[in-house]
Amino acid sequence: MTMTDATNDAAMRPMSEALDEELQALQAAGLRRTMRAVQQRNAGTVMLHGERIADFASNDYLGLAADPRVARAASAVLQAEGTGAGAARLISGNHPIHDSLERALARFKGCEHALLFPSGYMVNIGVIPALVDARDVIYSDTLNHASLIDGCRLSKATIRVFPHCDLDELGAMLEADRGRYRRALIVVEGVFSMDGDVFPLDGLVDLAQRFGAWTYVDDAHGTGVLGARGTGAIEHCGVTGRIDVVVGTLGKALGTSGAWVAGTQTLIELLTSRARSFIFTTGTPPAMAAASLEALRLAEVEPWRREAVRERARRLRGRLRDGGREVTGAADGHIVPVVIGDPTRTMAVVAELRRRGFLVGGVRPPTVPAGTSRLRISVSAVHPMELVDALSANVLDVLRKVFG
């Protein structure tokens, strides 16, 4: 049999058979993923298979996802306007509350204007290709989120990947490429979703100004939590108004759904005409926009929420470190990773914690690099402190039993 014959035979196999083989390979490598149905989110807990357990796996950092005031705001607009936008916003799906939310988000982030998208993924795969193309170069942090990586690839720009948070190497790349491309775009996260650390955005701005590069910061995990006003990593690093493209999400600290990009009026007007993932999709349901507007208001007028997040993060990190476990990120960072390494062992720890009444994230490749599978623990303002202490004790106990 020739190689061509073998290839043809493989291609002609029934889909179910070929895909089942791939699933079995994922299973053997400890990389097969499944979903679980959770409901009745309340005070940092959820119902799972009829049992109420502590949820340390969500991104509901401020505890707003189940706030009744947010639900009432959505309900009022739901009754008045129905369930959906009905069309893309450029056709007949633009609602006054979309405009109100965009103005509020722009003000919150210290930008001129903002544009809503259905998700953060859709922001990144739409905005980046609208700004750069094959004539340009992108500098991307090696630990950037998959949506940023995909947006960079879709742009067809040359992509230079620099070591995580390494401004010296980024500067060397910018120097080496000086004058070779039409545009240079530096793409980073404000808070890295799997490591919990903050990019040094003040240094980023200095480099960008020196080399004439544009800056793109996805602050999905900083928004609502970091900074004196809770506006995110950009405020935390003291560079409000100095980032060219600011991305944020509604589905994490603000507890609703959707995302946005903010910047100058000119930027937003261009994206309205060029970002394909905005143009060719139905508008956000007005009720969800209403919920987001109320959640944003609460995040601003209830600063106790972000301080509670920081207190709980400091407590959890301190207990884990006292128990001999290394955790990365800032001392009060709300994302607490505990690297285990092997994906199968990681999921075994997750399963045992679940049996004990704690839901934590088990993160494996390709979400994180091979050999760095981990627990991803996230704290919420509404977690009782005694629950944080109980989690830390159980994590340490399970890890001792797994690793000795």
What is each residue range found by the language model?
Residues 212, 232-250, 269-273:
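Conserved active-site segment immediately N-terminal to the catalytic lysine
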Residues 1-2, 68, 72-76, 80, ...:
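PLP-dependent enzyme catalytic core of the Aspartate aminotransferase-like
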Residues 72, 76-119:
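Conserved N-terminal alpha-helix of the aminotransferase class I/II PLP-enzyme fold
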Residues 247-249, 253-320, 325-328:
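PLP-dependent aminotransferase class I/II
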Residues 307-317, 321-357, 367, 371-372, ...:
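Conserved PLP-binding catalytic core of the aspartate aminotransferase-like
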Residues 127-146:
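Conserved PLP-anchoring active-site segment centered on the Schiff-base-forming lysine
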Residues 160, 164-217:
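Active-site phosphate-binding strand-loop segment of PLP-dependent enzymes
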Residues 15, 19-83, 213:
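N-terminal "arm"/small-domain region of PLP-dependent enzymes with the aminotransferase-like
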